[in-house]
Amino acid sequence: MKTTRLYLSNDTSSRAAGAGRLADAWSERPEIQLIRTSSRGAFFLEPMVERDTPSGREAWFNVAPDDLPRIVDAVGGTPVAGIPFLQQQTRFTFANFGITEPLALDEYQTHGGLKGFEAAQSLSPEAIIEELRISRLRGRGGAAFPVWKKWQVAQQTESEQKYVVANADEGDAGTYC
């Protein structure tokens, strides 16, 4: 029997929308291999299931457990590249969301993960801060404070002991995708 790989997100918002229920219902199905991924952020479409087809990755929206046969048969899917919500975005940090398993280091590396880290190891602290400045990367909070400025202030603070504080508030559902 041929096994079909299905991709189903495993973050808090997707689970709240029913992804966990699908995973439970399909966990022992021999015709599929269920890959748990991070979400693409289109929570209004969750639970969303994806699979690879000869014409590319396709998705099924608001899926129920009894939708499995049509997904395995690739009937009624929507090309992921054609989802309007995703077409409006250029993803950098979240480029692999919905594609890789978030906690699988080997998958992360296969998709280019750690290249930035490896490159940064040869840079000076000042060069890293300059790269952050050029990137225009900002915090995701309401102030959208420039990341480079935070790092520069930490670097320039005269102290033998420094602290980095991360705001670990998940007030926005799914923040820690």
Named regions from a protein language model:
Residues 1-177:
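Feature of Fe-S/electron-transfer and energy-metabolism proteins
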